């Protein structure tokens, strides 16, 4: 069973709110790099980057980060699935002494964020890393928390949260999928 929990209007308002929060929290924006975790986290990061540009008239540098080989669950991949390929980052931007805004779509166990933090080390030593999560669904296995949250959605472990974006799904919405009985 599927339930839409964030429609397109709510989705875009959430992007706007998170962007405002980032601007309000940072006195200077010229030391910020936005890093989006591929795939949907990168698209959400791009939306936030564009909104900040509209609001503050500043173009922030950004990176689309592939964390494939930093994950700790590759051995659990389906035996019939293709071998993972690493596409790296969209560009190399040093994050040394920069404030990094790390963006992902869903925060669940925390393992994706741990992998992203490991991957970021290859880009330098950040002055600070803050986390933007579009949907926090709970069930953490690691001590990870977001600095900016679009929406908290309590779920059961059997449910799935899907953040849908224009680039990958031809729409902006968030769906909660429950197993059929």
Curated annotation (Swiss-Prot):
Gene3D superfamilies reported for this sequence: 3.40.50.2020
UniProt catalytic activity: UMP + diphosphate = 5-phospho-alpha-D-ribose 1-diphosphate + uracil
Binding site for substrate: 39-40, 104-112, 137, 161
Motif (PRPP-binding): 100-112
Root EC class: transferase
EC number per UniProt: 2.4.2.9
HAMAP family assigned to the protein according to its UniProt record, in alphabetical order: PyrR
Family, as annotated: Belongs to the purine/pyrimidine phosphoribosyltransferase family. PyrR subfamily.
Protein name (database record): Bifunctional protein PyrR
Gene: pyrR
